[in-house]
C-alpha cells in the first residue's frame, strides 16, 4: 500500500528502531540533518518537503535526556513552520516521567512541563510506551496513545516457559507495579506475588517481605523500567533465597545506568527481557539480557492512526516468531 503523504523521521536517540519501523511500514525514513553550533546549540534542518504531509517523529528522550528533548522540540518547530499537515510524536521512552508529582515542598512537576513544551511546539498526537505514571496522559490536551509492552513480554515467556510446562509465578517488585504485574499474570494465566519493599533513599531499596508462594517455581519479575537495577536484583536474590528455582526479570525501558550491568551479571537473574524503547550501546549489553523489538507494534500503530482505524487490537499483539 502507498503512504505518499505519511513520513517518518528519526533524530539521534533511537535511529535503529526507527529504521525497523520504516521497514515494517514499507517506507524510507525522512531526510533530516541534525548538528550543533560551536557553542553547543542544536541545529535541525529538514532536507525534503513536508508540506501537507502527516509526519511522525520517533525520538526517545533518554540519555542525554536534555539534548534529545531539545532536538525533538526544534524538529517540531521546523515541521510546523514547513506546513506539515500533522505532527505526531512517537516517544517510546518518556524522559522525566518519574517527576510526575510534588513529593516534597518546592518541587516541580517536570513531566507536566515536558507535556506543555511538546504541545506548544506543535504536537498533534503522542504515541508512547508504558509511562512510569499513567496519569501523565492527563497532562496533555491532545490524543495520547499509551501502548503496553506486556503483550510482547508475555508472548516471549509463554513460548519460552509456559509452553514447556514450567510452574511459573509473576512477581511485582513493589506495590506500585501490581497492576502491571497483574496484566502479565493474566496474559500467562499465572499466579501473582508481590514484594513489599521500603526505600530509605533514592535508588536504594530494601526487601522486607514477599507475599505469595514462590518456592519451587520459576519467577518472572516485571517493572516499567530498570535504572540502576538495585530494586530488581535485590528482588531476584530474595526470591532465590526463598526457594524459587529460577528468576527471570523483564521491563519495557532498559535505562541501565551506573552499576546496573554489574548488578545484573552478579545477581540471581537468569535472563532479563527488555524492549528496545531505549538504544542499548555495547557497554550496556550482557549475555543475560534479551532485547525484543517494538518495531512491529509501532509500525502497526502508525498505520492505524494514519488510516483512522482503532488501536485496541494492538493490546492483544503477538510477538513475531523471528524474535523468539
Swiss-Prot record:
Broadest EC class assigned to this enzyme: transferase
CDD domains: PRTases_typeI
Active site as annotated: 197
Residues at which ATP binds: 39-41, 98-99
GO biological process, one term: 5-phosphoribose 1-diphosphate biosynthetic process
Binding site for D-ribose 5-phosphate: 199, 223, 227-231
Binding site residues for Mg(2+) 2: 174
GO function terms (MF aspect): ATP binding; kinase activity; magnesium ion binding; ribose phosphate diphosphokinase activity
Top-rank lineage group of the source organism: Bacteria
Subcellular location, principal: cytoplasm
Compartment(s): Cytoplasm
Residues binding Mg(2+) 1: 132
The keyword Cytoplasm is assigned to this record: yes
Catalytic activity: D-ribose 5-phosphate + ATP = 5-phospho-alpha-D-ribose 1-diphosphate + AMP + H(+)
Any matching Pfam family: Pribosyltran_N
Annotated Gene Ontology cellular component terms: cytoplasm; ribose phosphate diphosphokinase complex
Disulfide bonds: none
Needed cofactors: Mg(2+)
Pathway this chain belongs to: Metabolic intermediate biosynthesis; 5-phospho-alpha-D-ribose 1-diphosphate biosynthesis; 5-phospho-alpha-D-ribose 1-diphosphate from D-ribose 5-phosphate (route I): step 1/1
E.C. numbers: 2.7.6.1
Keyword terms, alphabetized: ATP-binding, Cytoplasm, Kinase, Magnesium, Metal-binding, Nucleotide biosynthesis, Nucleotide-binding, Transferase
Job description of the protein: Involved in the biosynthesis of the central metabolite phospho-alpha-D-ribosyl-1-pyrophosphate (PRPP) via the transfer of pyrophosphoryl group from ATP to 1-hydroxyl of ribose-5-phosphate (Rib-5-P).
Subunit structure: Homohexamer.
Full protein name: Ribose-phosphate pyrophosphokinase 1
Lineage: Bacteria, Bacillati, Bacillota, Bacilli, Lactobacillales
Gene that this sequence comes from: prs1
Amino acid at each position: 500500500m502507498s503512504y505518499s503523504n505519511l513520513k517518518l523521521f528519526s533524530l539521534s536517540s533511537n535511529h535503529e528502531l526507527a529504521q525497523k519501523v520504516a521497514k515494517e511500514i514499507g517506507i524510507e525514513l525522512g531526510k533530516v540533518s541534525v548538528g550543533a553550533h560551536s557553542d553547543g546549540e542544536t541545529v535541525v534542518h529538514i532536507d525534503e518537503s513536508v508540506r501537507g504531509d502527516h509526519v511522525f517523529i520517533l525520538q526517545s528522550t533518554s540519555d542525554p535526556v536534555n539534548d534529545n528533548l531539545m532536538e525533538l522540540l526544534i524538529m517540531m518547530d521546523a515541521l510546523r513552520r514547513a506546513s506539515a499537515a500533522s505532527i505526531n510524536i512517537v516517544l517510546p521512552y518518556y524522559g522525566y516521567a518519574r517527576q510526575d508529582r510534588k513529593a516534597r515542598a518546592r518541587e516541580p512537576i517536570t513531566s507536566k512541563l515536558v507535556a506543555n513544551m511538546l504541545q506548544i511546539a506543535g504536537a498533534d498526537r503522542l504515541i508512547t510506551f508504558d509511562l512510569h505514571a499513567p496519569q501523565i496522559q492527563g497532562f496533555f490536551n491532545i490524543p495520547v496513545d499509551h501502548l503496553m509492552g506486556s503483550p510482547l513480554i508475555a508472548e516471549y515467556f509463554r513460548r519460552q516457559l509456559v509452553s514447556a510446562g514450567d510452574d511459573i509465578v509473576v512477581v511485582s517488585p513493589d506495590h506500585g507495579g501490581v497492576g502491571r504485574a497483574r496484566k502479565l499474570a493474566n496474559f500467562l494465566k499465572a499466579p501473582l506475588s508481590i514484594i513489599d519493599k521500603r526505600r530509605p533513599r533514592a535508588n536504594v531499596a530494601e526487601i522486607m517481605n514477599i507475599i505469595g508462594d514462590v518456592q519451587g517455581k520459576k519467577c518472572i519479575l516485571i517493572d516499567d523500567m530498570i535504572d540502576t537495577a538495585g530494586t530488581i536484583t535485590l528482588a531476584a536474590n530474595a526470591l532465590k533465597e526463598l526457594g524459587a528455582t529460577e528468576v527471570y526479570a523483564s521491563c519495557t525501558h532498559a535505562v541501565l545506568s551506573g552499576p546496573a550491568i554489574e548488578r545484573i551479571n552478579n545477581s540471581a537473574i537468569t535472563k532479563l527481557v527488555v524492549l528496545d524503547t531505549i538504544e542499548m550501546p555495547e557497554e550496556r549489553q550482557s549475555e543475560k539480557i534479551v532485547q525484543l523489538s517494538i518495531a512491529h507494534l509501532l509500525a502497526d500503530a502508525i498505520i492505524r492512526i494514519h488510516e483512522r482505524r482503532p488501536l485496541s487490537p494492538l493490546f492483544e499483539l503477538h510477538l513475531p516468531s523471528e524474535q523468539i
